[in-house]
Design a protein with these regions (language model features):
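Extracytoplasmic beta-strand/coil segments of soluble accessory domains associated
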Residues: 55-56, 61-96, 114
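Transmembrane beta-barrel wall of Gram-negative outer-membrane proteins
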Residues: 154-184, 195-236, 271-292, 346-347
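Membrane-embedded beta-barrel scaffold of Gram-negative outer-membrane proteins
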Residues: 292-298, 304-306, 441, 449, ...
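Short, acidic, small-residue-rich periplasmic hinge/interaction motif at the N-terminus
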Residues: 3-53, 84-85, 122, 286
């Protein structure tokens, strides 16, 4: 063990024996300050994830909620810095394309993470497409000697979650890692009802992760990666729904389907299936001591199929005078692409990065919509109609960038970059985006940065709305039939921030940011399907400030927390008219615009972890949310108010039992989520943009977990 104090240590030489590996672990009370970055950076280690309540059984969104400016918006979506999703996932530096369900199913389980480096805003030129935040995950890989574990977690909400992982080597040059996890619960999708009773909410999901690394020689390394996620979700329902309050629907349905008898509202049977696969191969090559590059090729398939229960759903139509329908949806997309990253260390003053990425996406969006004809007076009539549409699109995206990190001296760093983005999908668009960042190290304990950059964010091709469906003359006809193509968002981004090492055991960071957009992109849930549809405002603004504190009070006591304030407003509707009601469109087009659905004014989280006698860990977690936007009543302006705030407290205790066999141990954990059983809605369907449904948070829940390490 080598301890480094105030005095520089003498040189250390590590010598590898011919047949044994040396494991080198660098331990610091806190992560060092990033004094050359022009953005807010945050890091999560494997140990920090395992210390959370539920440990590494947490899902992606649960882990993300521990970083600054992260807002939870239901359906496993996390909105960072007041952007709707707009999160870029990377595995070992390679961007992972979104799924058709917009990250509704986790692409990669936190169980496979070794660490995650997070960049919030202030992106250098090599980061594009999704730019609110970048989550760069370094995954586990094989080691010698090999390692593995078998884990079982279960508890409230009919939850059962077995998992298995194993990593090792084959020969001297090939390493591998395998993970499989299966999850079953009755809260796969947040229900519209408060409390423990969940109606029609069962879900199952299976995830597989396979990684292989081949070290050809000292200059060439190859990595293969394969991800698979298969899931089925029942759509939760509410009891006590009023059957055919208008008296018009049931006679029409029974006239179209003689003998039809509607079920109770909680028995309406809608569900969604998801099927996602992703694979890539990366070649990393060291040309010499100053030149490095990586070349990657990737392929992704993603599919989500939503099946409605048309007759029973339509039987509970509240007001046939408003547009109504029930619909099946089938979204399917294939993406292939290549990415090239080049790094050149010109000198101690200049670190140059350049590269390109080419992407091709083919998407299919099939819709089968059920409704009735319009009698000309706004009333349904005739037999039940079945309307079909089959949209097929091919889109291309090209990205190019060059970046110079210029450090003329030890105090100043200038990050100067330029990137170009071109897309061809429903329309052809492009932008050249300068990125300029400056970092100033006042002293080793205090660093300040400023940033300005242009951002270009095209919508996901596979999530564009089904525009070809002809509903004219039916009760599904929208109140506004305007059909503009969604434009790519173009934004000016400003950021200023600072990092402070208060002492060896505490770091503090502050960041303020402002984003001014043309064609501010957004997405919403329209109807009961969890599949989201994109729309855009003519312009928008987002702003906020956040602060984060990390503490290592003793060797066994750590804490971290953050608080953020933010705002998002949209003005004028650019696209998506046929998805919205006339009142919503009028509110958006009003002089003052509207607050965005995903906006949350105040957000905060905190975690305290204490390790007792090396083997027992206690963890407490707090999550505070001031509430997503809604309106007080149907006459109030859209999103003019917010849902009630809520604060969630989670607790965890975990103990490690050593086993008599070499290198083996057993972990036993007990977790409580929502300790004080607060009843709250994550969002409320009424008063916000779209025909959304409410989503209620998890009540007090108990979980047990056991993990055998071998």
């Amino acid at each position: 063990i080598l301890k480094v104090g105030a005095t520089p240590p003498p040189p250390v030489t590590l010598t590898l024996s011919p047949t044994r590996e040396i494991s080198l672990e660098v331990v610091s009370p806190l992560a060092p300050i990033q004094y050359k970055a022009s953005s807010e950076t945050y890091a999560l280690s494997r140990k920090e994830i395992e210390a959370l309540p539920r440990g590494n059984n947490n899902e992606l969104h649960d882990v993300l909620l521990t970083i600054p400016s992260a807002v939870y918006g239901s359906l496993k979506q996390v909105h960072i810095r007041q952007d709707h999703a707009n999160l870029q996932l990377r595995i070992d530096g390679v961007p992972i394309p979104d799924t058709v369900s917009s990250t509704f199913s986790d692409v990669i389980s936190p169980r496979a993470w070794e660490r995650a480096d997070i960049i919030l805003g202030g992106m250098e030129a090599q980061y594009g497409n999704k730019a609110a935040a970048v989550l760069d995950i370094t995954t586990k890989s094989g080691t010698k000697p090999s390692f593995g574990s078998v884990q079982m977690m279960g508890g409230s909400n009919k939850t059962i979650n077995p998992s298995f992982e194993y990593g090792g080597t084959i020969g001297e040059k090939f390493r591998f890692y395998i993970l499989n996890s299966h999850t079953a619960t009755n809260r796969g999708i947040e229900p519209p009802t408060l409390g423990r009773s969940v109606y029609h909410g069962q879900s199952e999901r299976n995830q597989t992760f396979i990684r292989g690394d081949y070290q050809h020689d000292n200059r060439n390394n190859f990595t293969w990666l394969f991800l698979n996620s298969v899931a089925k979700y029942q759509i939760p329902t509410s009891p006590g729904g009023e059957l055919d309050p208008s008296g018009q629907m049931l006679p029409l349905l029974q006239g179209s389907r003689p003998g039809f008898s509607p079920v109770a509202s909680q028995a309406i049977d809608e569900f969604q299936k998801e099927n996602n696969q992703y694979g890539h191969m990366v070649w990393r090559h060291d040309v010499n001591a100053n030149n490095f590059f990586s070349l990657s090729g990737y392929m992704r398939h993603t599919r989500a199929t939503f099946k409605t229960d048309p007759l029973n759903l339509l039987a509970y139509t509240a007001d046939p005078a408003e547009p109504f329908s029930a619909a099946d949806q089938d979204r399917n997309a294939y993406s292939t692409g290549v990415r090239f990253d080049y790094t050149y260390t010109h000198s101690k003053q200049h670190l140059i990065k350049a590269g390109f990425q080419l992407d091709r996406t083919q998407s299919v969006n099939k819709t089968r919509l059920f409704t009735f004809a319009d009698d000309g007076g706004g009333n349904p009539t005739g037999d039940l109609l079945s309307l079909n549409a089959d949209n097929r699109q091919i889109g291309y995206r090209q990205e190019f960038w060059i970046q110079d990190q210029w450090s003329p001296n030890d105090q100043w760093t200038f990050n100067l970059g330029l990137r170009g983005d071109i897309v061809q999908y429903q329309r052809n668009e492009g932008q050249v985006s300068p990125r300029i960042g400056v970092s100033y190290k006042y002293n080793p304990s205090n660093v300040f940065h400023v940033f300005y950059g242009r951002m270009f964010t095209p919508p996901n091709l596979e999530a564009l709305s089904f525009a070809k469906l002809n509903t004219l003359g039916t009760r599904a006809q929208p109140e506004d039939v305007t059909n503009n193509s969604v434009r790519a968002e173009r934004a000016h981004y400003f950021e200023v921030g600072s990092y402070h090492a208060l002492n060896r055991y505490a770091t503090l960071q502050f960041t303020g940011w402002y984003k001014l957009s043309n064609f501010l992109s957004d997405a919403g849930q329209f109807g009961t399907t969890p599949l989201l549809n994109y729309f855009a405002f003519e312009r928008g603004s987002q702003r906020g400030i956040d602060g984060a504190l990390k503490l290592q009070l003793t060797e066994n006591l750590t804490a971290r927390g953050n608080v953020a304030w933010g705002q998002c407003k949209g003005y004028g509707l650019q696209s998506g008219h046929f998805l919205l009601e006339a009142k919503e469109i009028a509110d958006i087009n009003s002089q003052g615009g509207v607050f965005c659905d995903h906006m949350q004014t105040l957000t905060s989280s905190a975690i305290v972890s204490y390790r007792l006698l090396e083997r027992t860990t206690f963890t407490g977690q707090m999550l505070f949310a001031s509430g997503l936007r809604t309106s007080e009543n149907e006459d109030a302006k859209t999103n003019s108010s917010h849902s009630p705030s809520y604060t969630i407290y989670n607790l965890s205790i975990a103990h490690v039992f050593p086993l008599p066999w070499e290198g083996q141990k057993f972990l036993l954990g007990f977790d409580i989520v929502n300790l004080f059983d607060q009843r709250y809605y994550i969002n409320q369907g009424e008063g916000s943009i779209g025909l959304g449904v409410s989503h209620a948070g998890m009540p007090r829940s108990f979980f047990f977990r056991g993990q055998w390490f071998f």
